[in-house]
Design a protein with these regions (language model features):
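C-terminal and inter-domain tail/linker signature
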Residues: 1-182
């Protein structure tokens, strides 16, 4: 099996999407029958034509201009990269892959994102992208967290700062276990 530089291919893929905004360069990093699935919204596609259409009209040029991806961790295997990051942006445009059909709210959003990228013959074959959609909806004002075990921006901040308090959503239960034998 050839030793492909997965990190270089992955970094070029991300650069093509988020910096160069170049659909053709993005597609050049992928195998012809690649699959992309933004899991919470089931957006993406399978195969060259469907993915090129998705990237051209619903992804590459539709990010808010202030989007920032903050790396948290990366695990590299023989044919897989798992990237953990925090995405920060202001919801100033329709973002089809993240909030399909939701008009801009002007609100700030910070969300942890995990991407599982699989490679085949030195090119990207599959991306599964995960984030907490409830947190996004709370942050843009479309979901009231009252009485629900969900949080807004706090989840991203906790990923970036492990010293922030844990167990806030189960405060009563946490307090009830205080002083018990461990």
């Amino acid at each position: 099996m050839p030793n492909h530089d997965l990190i270089a291919v992955w970094e070029e893929h991300l650069r093509s999407e988020f910096v160069a905004h170049d659909v053709d360069a993005t597609m050049d990093t992928m195998v012809p029958d690649a699959c992309v699935n933004h899991v919470p919204t089931m957006t993406g596609g399978v195969g060259h034509d469907e993915l090129k259409r998705f990237y051209r009209y619903h992804f590459v040029d539709v990010h808010p201009p202030d989007i920032e991806l903050i790396p948290v961790s990366r695990t590299v295997g023989t044919d897989t990269i798992v990237d953990e990051m925090v995405a920060k942006f202001t919801h100033t445009c329709v973002i089809d892959h993240l909030l399909p059909g939701i008009p801009p709210t002007g609100r700030s959003v910070e969300i942890p994102v995990v991407v599982v990228a699989q490679f085949q013959d030195g090119k990207l074959a599959s991306e599964h992208i995960y984030w907490d959609q409830a947190s996004v909806l709370v942050q843009i004002g479309k979901l009231d967290p009252a009485g629900l075990p969900i949080a807004g921006v706090e989840i991203a901040r906790k990923v970036l700062d492990r010293t922030l308090p844990s167990n806030r959503l189960m405060a009563r239960e946490w307090q009830g276990s205080e002083g018990k034998p461990i």
